Amino acid sequence: MKILKWLSVADRFYKVYLDKQLAPYGINSSQHMFLVKICGSPGIQQDSLMDMFYVHPSNIVRTIAALEKQGMVTRSPSDQDKRTWNLYPTERALSVIDEIQDACKRTEDILTQGFAEAGQEMFGDFLMQAGKNIAAELHIERKEDEFND
């Protein structure tokens, strides 16, 4: 039960910390990963985010709507499939994405404080494998290597 307890503790408190870091930009710890990906891949299809983040499509729709309302993202219908959207960062998003990524890096640094560099890499690999293990047990399939960083 030690693993479950400390995963829960780390999850709750990193979100509290990251929310405080991201508040000046009008986003939160549930939205940052979407914005980072959209800024790094302008025009990305909204549907592809499901495979990257292991979240339900309705969560993606709500998150993108919130980012759009905050002036961080714009949507346009996909030329290939009119049922989905291509997502683009706004100038506002591009102007703050470096600070957002810095806040994420600081949060990861705090989580891995006291770890050797190799230990930090292993910790990330172990967490990724743990996530894939539980997803597989629940028969949740995603495309491999879509967002392994």
What are these regions (language model features)?
Residues 56-57, 86-90, 143-149:
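Membrane-interacting alpha-helical segments
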Residues 16-59:
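N-terminal helix-turn-helix DNA-binding core of bacterial DNA-binding proteins
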Residues 10, 14, 53, 96-112, ...:
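Alpha-helical linker/hinge and terminal dimerization helices associated
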Residues 8, 36-40, 101, 128:
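Short, locally clustered residues in the helix-turn-helix/winged-helix DNA-binding domain
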Residues 1-25:
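N-terminal leader segment of winged-helix/HTH proteins
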Residues 65-128:
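Charged, amphipathic alpha-helical coiled-coil/dimerization segments
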Residues 1-5, 70, 86, 110, ...:
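Surface-exposed, interaction-prone regions with an acidic/low-complexity signature
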Residues 118-149:
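C-terminal regulatory/oligomerization modules of transcriptional regulators
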